[in-house]
Amino acid sequence: MDNKLDIKAFLDKDEQKDLLRLLTAGSVDDGKSTLIGRLLFDSKKLYEDQLDALERDSKRVGNAGEHIDYALLLDGLKAEREQGITIDVAYRYFSTNGRKFIIADTPGHEQYTRNMITGGSTANLAIILVDARTGVITQTRRHTFLVSLLGIKHVVLAVNKMDLVDFSEERFDEIVSEYKKFVEPLGIPDVNCIPLSALDGDNVVDKSERTPWYKGISLLDFLETVHIDNDHNFTDFRFPVQYVLRPNLDFRGFCGKVASGIVRKGDTVMALPSGKTSKVKSIVTYDGELDYAFPPQSVTLTLEDEIDVSRGEMLVHPDNLPIVDRNFEAMMVWMDEEPMDINKSFFIKQTTNLSRTRIDAIKYKVDVNTMEHLSIDNGQLTKDNLPLQLNQIARVVLTTAKELFFDPYKKNKSCGSFILIDPITNNTSAVGMIIDRVEMKDMAATDDIPVLDLSKLDIAPEHHAAIEKVVKELERQGLSIKVIK
C-alpha cells in the first residue's frame, strides 16, 4: 500500500532532527511542572494509558480543582505529589515535526540548588517562570544567576498565570522591564519574554486570542526555531583522549569526543603534555570514515606517526593551544552534604583527565539570593572560616598535582568545567567552572609533588623506561610524581 507507514523512513527522519536540551526553573507554585505537562498534552505527545492515568491521578491527588493537573506528569516522587512540589530533577523527552527535546524540570527551593545545577549542566536553554501576580522575586534572581553561572545563552522568561491578572499588558511590561534591568549585567545574550497561562494553554503551543497585544510567537514555536548551532565553539580544536584503541597490530586509534573546534584529515595536531606533533591519518566512526569532525561527535583519530598518547591527554592544533597549568581560579558549587574539609585533598576530573587537587583559597562566597559577595579575610582558609556547605557557591583557587589542559568556561564549557571527587566516599563533592589561570608564586615552597631521581637509584639505565611507564600509569590515576633522570 502506498499509504503504509514506512517505519525506517520515519526513524531516519527523526534521527536527523536537531536536539534541544532545556531546563525549567521557578519558585514554588509558579507552574513549572504544569507548563511542561501542558506542553506534552497540547502537542499530542501522550499515550492513551498516560492520559487515563493522568485523569485518575488528577481526581485523587491533583491540585487543579476540576481541571486536569498536568504537573502530575512530571512530579513522580511520592513526596513531590504529597507536597505538590518538585524535589528531584524530572526529565522528559518528546519530539515535534521540527525538533527533539529533553526537558529537565528542576526544583525551585534553595536547598535543592545542586539539583538545578545538575539539571542545567547540559542545557542549551532555560525557561524561567514567574507568577504574573508576584512578578520578579528573590527566587527568580537566584535561578537567573545560576543560569548565567552555567553559561546558558538562551533564556525564556515565561510570565505564567496571566489569566489571574486579566491578561494585562501593563502588568506584563512591568515584569519584563524589571527582569531585563536585572539580567543585563549577567551577560546572558538572548532573553525572550512570553505571557502565558499553563493551566489554560494560552501561548504554550498556539497563540492565544486573549493576548492580542502580544506580537511574538508561542512558547513551542520559539523552542522549535531558536538557533543553538552557534553555541558550540568551532574555533579551538580540543580532543581529550578517552581510550586508546588497538584491536590488532596494524591499527592504533585515539577515541574520544570532539570537545570543541573542527579537525580534518591531514591536519597537524599536537599531543599534550608531550608536545609531540603528527598529522591526522583518518577519522573513523562506526558508520565509516569522515573527512572532518566537529562537536559533539565521538570519533577515533589515527595519526601518521607512532607517538605516545594515553587517556587523559589531549590532541590540539599546535597554533591554538589551551592553557596548561596547575593553578587556576574557578566558581565552584558545593554538592556534598558533608561540609568542605580544609585539610582534605580531592580528585579533580576535568575532561578525561584525573589528578589530585587541593583548595588553596576562597576569594569570596556568593549569596545566591542577593548576588552579594561575602569576602573572606585574606582569601585564606582557616579553622575560623566557615567552610563551604551544601549548595553554597564560591570563587576559589585550586592547585592540582599535575598540569591540566583547559580553557575558561565562558570560552569552552567542555574544557572549562570540572568536578571534585571525595577520595574516600567517591561522592561528587563539588562542580566548578574555570575562570582563568592564576599565578601562585607565593605557594611555590609548598609544592608537594614527590620527586623520583633516577640517578640516585641503583638501577641499570635500561630499566628506566619501565619505571617511567609505571609513573605514567600512576599519573593517569591522578597521582603525580616528578621524574629526574
Swiss-Prot record:
Residues 26-33 are annotated as: G1. Residues 197-199 are annotated as: G5. Coiled coil: none annotated. PROSITE patterns: G_TR_1, G_TR_2. It catalyses: sulfate + ATP + H(+) = adenosine 5'-phosphosulfate + diphosphate. With CysD forms the ATP sulfurylase (ATPS) that catalyzes the adenylation of sulfate producing adenosine 5'-phosphosulfate (APS) and diphosphate, the first enzymatic step in sulfur assimilation pathway. APS synthesis involves the formation of a high-energy phosphoric-sulfuric acid anhydride bond driven by GTP hydrolysis by CysN coupled to ATP hydrolysis by CysD. NCBIfam families: CysN, PRK05124.1. Heterodimer composed of CysD, the smaller subunit, and CysN. This is Sulfate adenylyltransferase subunit 1. The gene is cysN.
